[in-house]
């Protein structure tokens, strides 16, 4: 049985710092406002708050273009606001993790500006330069937006490398002074009280550290882990790792690198299951996954702040997911993914959105919820690229969705105000008034998951079920067994279960009131409604 750490029991809630709530009325979300909404986040059952970047930034890439890693952008607040937010969160039982964006900086960062001016500058080797771009380098991350990962800089008289946007030059992660700067960043924020970091673009920075060879770059993760653990043994590193399934093991190491890894592999196959209304794709993905080392785990989610990346599941499967969830060309991006939020992808069907959450919370690993998914927020396809899924939180039917008291024209990003997902219809205040709303369903699921934490750290057993629309996962601890079932199909079914332990299985969570119960033994059968889910437990004492 795996050693259980505090994060194995976690439920993470991701907040876009600029879009969650605006306390001072300038139209821009801020840290003081997030502090005011901590009770809401905690009421959902969340135990960890993940903040997207709030550092000094030109804001050309939603804050991931950082010009000072140690200073909050004044639009978000001050370092005092950060410390107060962390302290208040801790009082409520919430830990706070922040972004560690070290694969690149903003082109406006003082390091890059100094590097451009003088080839003899000590900051010149902080970045990757070339007189002529290599012929066989990686393609750009944003095809159709960027033509190459190399950009000519007139002032520097050389090309610089940028894996992402041209205004985000890549750091030279094989250069010791850069690593020393990163150590200072980690130290600063751990001393401020954060409980860990989400390591942005982890697979790309490994390649940079190894000068194109991932094998030589993995030790950087070991080093970062050592730095973090030396300062706070409880702090975590959560890595953004989109790689082939067999390569995840390198990011865990022997349990001495990343403790938590975002499971892009499983996320892609989850959407294939939802598109096909069959459990088989998720089953296939789970069977292929590596087992995390002791003290480590995968992290699962439904949708994040980027596109749904479908690379790696095969062209035919990718086309099927896109055809199902992004039938219009405007819904796809970068030739690889879907730029929609969860609720519009599932046609606003509360049953189906609830099912997706039930699957998320049943999967082995730690769940992440993105702000707004719990109420079924929509997207704004008039916004470019990934910004379609980055709109203000919808708190009420009041002006600006209750997000800000600023004039609507003063909002940098406006709430969704038309269509079936408009804020006048989809908002927290309205959802709280209806006992069967998606918000209440998701909250009940999460609260159940925080009590039945077996998926966070225990090995799972995949059940062979008929019909194949139903996903079945069984977890066993020293004191109980937990059975989780989910029907991916819109058709009601009767599930034939494999032999289970004799005795009565107590219901934990159900999508509706069912007339039948579960007793173990052979040939047990259970009813499941279309997009239904049922969780059970059985004591071993």
Feature-to-residue mapping (PLM):
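Active-site and adjacent substrate-binding regions of carbohydrate-active enzymes
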Residues: 1-541
């Amino acid at each position: 049985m795996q050693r259980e750490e505090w994060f194995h029991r976690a439920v993470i809630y991701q907040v876009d710092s600029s879009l969650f709530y605006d306390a001072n009325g300038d139209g821009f979300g801020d840290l003081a406002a997030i502090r005011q909404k901590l009770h809401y986040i905690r009421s959902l059952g969340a135990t960890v708050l993940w903040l997207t970047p709030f550092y000094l930034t030109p804001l050309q890439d939603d804050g991931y273009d950082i010009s000072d890693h140690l200073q909050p952008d004044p639009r978000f607040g001050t370092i005092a606001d950060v410390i107060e937010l962390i302290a208040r969160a801790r009082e409520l039982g919430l830990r706070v993790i922040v972004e560690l964006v070290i694969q690149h900086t903003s082109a406006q960062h003082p390091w890059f500006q100094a590097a451009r001016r003088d080839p003899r500058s000590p900051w010149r080797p902080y970045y990757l330069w070339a007189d002529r771009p290599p012929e066989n380098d990686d393609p750009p991350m944003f095809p159709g937006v960027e033509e190459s990962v190399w950009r000519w800089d007139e002032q520097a008289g050389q090309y610089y490398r940028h894996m992402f946007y041209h205004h985000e030059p890549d750091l030279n992660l094989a250069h010791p002074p850069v690593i020393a700067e990163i150590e200072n960043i980690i130290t600063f924020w751990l001393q401020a009280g954060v409980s860990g970091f989400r390591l942005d673009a982890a697979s790309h920075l490994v390649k940079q550290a190894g000068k194109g060879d991932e094998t030589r770059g993995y030790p950087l993760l070991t080093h970062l882990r050592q730095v973090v653990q030396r300062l706070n043994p409880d702090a975590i590193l959560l890595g953004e790792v989109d790689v082939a399934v067999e390569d995840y093991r390198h990011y865990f190491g022997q349990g001495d690198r990343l403790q938590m890894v975002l499971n892009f592999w499983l996320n892609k196959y989850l959407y294939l299951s939802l598109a096909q209304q069959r459990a088989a794709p998720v089953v296939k993905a789970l069977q292929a996954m590596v087992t995390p080392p002791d003290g480590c785990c995968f992290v699962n989610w439904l949708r994040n702040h980027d596109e749904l990346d479908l690379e790696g599941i095969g062209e035919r499967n990718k086309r099927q997911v896109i055809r199902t969830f992004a039938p219009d060309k405007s819904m796809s991006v970068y030739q690889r993914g879907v730029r929609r939020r969860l609720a519009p992808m599932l046609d606003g069907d509360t049953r189906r959105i609830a099912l997706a959450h039930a699957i998320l919370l049943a999967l082995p690993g730690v769940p992440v919820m993105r702000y707004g998914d719990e109420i079924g927020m929509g997207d704004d396809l008039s916004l470019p690229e990934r910004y379609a899924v980055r709109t203000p939180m919808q708190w009420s039917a009041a002006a600006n969705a209750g997000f800000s008291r600023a004039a609507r024209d003063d909002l940098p990003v406006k709430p969704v105000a038309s269509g079936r997902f408009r804020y006048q219809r989809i908002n927290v205040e309205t959802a709280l008034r209806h006992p069967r709303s998606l918000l209440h369903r998701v909250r009940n699921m999460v609260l159940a998951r925080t009590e039945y934490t077996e998926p966070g750290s225990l090995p799972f057993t995949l059940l062979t079920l008929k019909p194949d629309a139903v996903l079945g996962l069984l977890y066993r601890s020293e004191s109980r067994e937990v059975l989780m079932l989910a029907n991916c199909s819109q058709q009601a079914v009767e599930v034939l279960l494999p032999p289970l332990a004799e005795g009565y299985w107590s219901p934990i969570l159900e999508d509706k009131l069912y007339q039948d119960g579960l007793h173990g033994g052979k040939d047990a059968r259970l009813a499941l409604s279309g997009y239904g889910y049922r969780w059970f437990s059985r004591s071993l004492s």
